[in-house]
Amino acid sequence: MREGLAVAEPQYEPDDLDRLLQLRAMYEVRGPGLLTWPSVPMPVVRTASIMFTDIRGFTRLTERFAHDPAGLLEVLNAHLKKVLRSIAICGGVVEKFVGDGVMATFGAGGEQPDHVDRAMAAAIGLIGANEALNRKSAADWGFRLEVGVGIASGPVVVGAVGSADRSELGVLGDVVNVAARLVTNAGPGEVLMTGTVYRAVADRLQSELTSQSAVRGRSGSLEIYRMALLGGRGELT
């Protein structure tokens, strides 16, 4: 995707997205425009980009809908549809839902040499799509949904997690933990990324170095970059 990262509308039906929201992972879906995990020997080690998303202030939002849980689900699903669409357009796979956010992989289910580009394009796309949703939520619901993103790239292992009685396909590795930690520190409309991710797109992306930083739950420090998409705008040229 290095040439022209313009995000086009996906070619699949809304029903596919509705079905997707009821599943744990995108690879379980068989539908036009939705990726499936290929049949490959397991486990397999690949270099991939991992992305986590998270709604900022979701706890306060749940309090707002304390007496209308169905309304909360409506709001969350409206947001997740935007997120899933951006990920699918860029060739990513939703590995699982994590509370109000998602964990998506690029390059884990199959070789994608441009997995970093794809992850960054998806992040830019989903924040922009969420901003469009905010125009509706502000008018209809009286509040905004703010989303943060964390991205890390590196080696991961893809394989069955569990036992013969019950197992599921999982993606494991240090970069998964790093991306999960980064998203907790990403502000509204921000993408936090590791130095590996930044250097892969630095010549085409404006970003700010936030300094060497310790990430809770791991030893040592990480080179972390922050990209702020004010108003949900950004591009990868």
What are these regions (language model features)?
Residues M1-A48, L205:
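Regulatory cytosolic signal-relay segments
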Residues V40-A121:
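Catalytic NTP-binding/metal-coordinating core of nucleotidyl cyclase/transferase enzymes
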Residues E74-G92, A108-V149, D174-V175, A180-V183:
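Alpha-helical scaffold within the catalytic cores of cyclic-nucleotide enzymes
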Residues V98-G99, A139-G150, V191-G195:
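Acidic/histidine metal-binding catalytic segments
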Residues T105-H115, V149-E168, P188-E190:
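Catalytic strand-loop-helix junctions within cyclic-nucleotide turnover domains
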Residues V116, S167-L172, L209, S213:
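Allosteric regulatory "coupling" segments in signal-transduction proteins
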Residues A152-S153, V161, D174-G195:
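Catalytic/regulatory signature loops of cyclic-dinucleotide turnover enzymes
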Residues V156, N185-T237:
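Cytosolic regulatory/linker segments at or just downstream of nucleotide-handling modules
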